[in-house]
């Protein structure tokens, strides 16, 4: 955990220097499919760093550290509308192509690209896993004992950002992204259980195709403080926002 925090602090310092034109503060949240509402670990998030290829096209990246309350696990026999993994910490690093449509008063950015993510300090949600097993086997009682193999994940995303100026130095940004990603999470172990007044049984499992489902909606609202020097064209894109 200390190494992750140090890496983010170093990235934050470098990114702040690189994005000296515009810096800001925003609050970002992630709503996963069949998961639980998640929040960022402030201030370990900065997004919108990149290079303007021309007036209309830019390449952007960044990094965010999320506290995931719960995520779904897919590609197993266990079916659940609730989170089976979490809580954990997740590092998210996007890379995106941005189409910049600037009007006289507002700017609309259209974004699409891919992302890398990695969850650490993982915990299986045995309460929901046991309930999924009971539903699968039609049992009254179930108790799972599983181990997992953690892996990084990848996916794609698309979204839009609306930037509205209030003055030469202050803007407000509203951003929404839809993310679709998975990370391999093979599960091994066993589960035991049965019905009342019946002998219990133990079943070995090997869910080698299990994956973390990182699909959901990310949205943020923030303030951007401009240095007032509206440099254009190629160069480092000055839109870094610390979330």
At which residue positions do the language-model features occur?
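Solvent-exposed, glycine/polar-rich loop segments of beta-barrel outer-membrane systems
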Residues: 125-146, 187-207
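A contiguous pocket-lining binding segment that forms or flanks enzyme active sites
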Residues: 141-165
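Extracellular loop and loop/strand-boundary signature of outer-membrane beta-barrel proteins
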Residues: 31-36, 76-85, 141-148, 205-209
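Predominantly the C-terminal beta-signal and adjacent terminal strand-loop region
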Residues: 161, 165-243
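Short sequence motifs at beta-strands and strand-loop junctions characteristic
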Residues: 38-42, 85-91, 146-155, 209-215
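Sec-dependent N-terminal signal peptides
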Residues: 4-14
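Short glycine/proline- and aromatic-enriched beta-strand/turn motifs that initiate or cap beta-hairpins
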Residues: 18-60, 66, 211, 216-218, ...
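Gram-negative (and chloroplast) outer-membrane scaffold detector with strong preference
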Residues: 49-135, 164-166, 214, 220-227
């Amino acid at each position: 955990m200390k190494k992750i925090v140090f890496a983010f602090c170093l990235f934050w310092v470098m990114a702040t220097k690189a994005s000296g034109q515009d810096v800001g503060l925003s609050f970002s949240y992630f709503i996963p499919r069949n998961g639980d509402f998640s929040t960022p670990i402030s201030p370990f998030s900065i997004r919108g760093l990149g290079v303007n290829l021309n007036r209309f096209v830019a390449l952007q990246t960044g990094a965010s550290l999320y506290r995931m309350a719960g995520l779904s696990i897919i590609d197993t026999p266990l079916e659940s509308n609730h989170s089976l993994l979490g809580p954990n910490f997740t590092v998210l690093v996007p890379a995106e192509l941005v189409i910049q449509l600037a009007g006289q008063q507002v700017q609309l950015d259209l974004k699409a690209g891919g992302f890398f993510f990695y969850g650490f300090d993982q915990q299986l949600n045995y309460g929901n896993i046991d309930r999924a097993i009971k539903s699968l086997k039609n049992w009254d009682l179930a108790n799972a004992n599983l181990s997992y193999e953690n892996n990084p994940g990848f996916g794609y995303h698309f979204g839009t950002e609306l930037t509205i100026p209030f003055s030469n130095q202050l803007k407000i940004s509203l951003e929404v992204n839809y993310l679709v990603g998975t990370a391999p999470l093979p599960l091994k172990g066993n589960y035991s259980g049965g019905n009342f007044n019946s002998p219990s049984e133990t079943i070995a499992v090997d869910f080698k195709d299990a994956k973390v489902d990182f699909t959901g909606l990310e949205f943020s609202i923030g303030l951007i403080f401009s240095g007032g020097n509206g440099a254009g064209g190629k160069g480092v894109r000055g839109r870094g926002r610390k979330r």
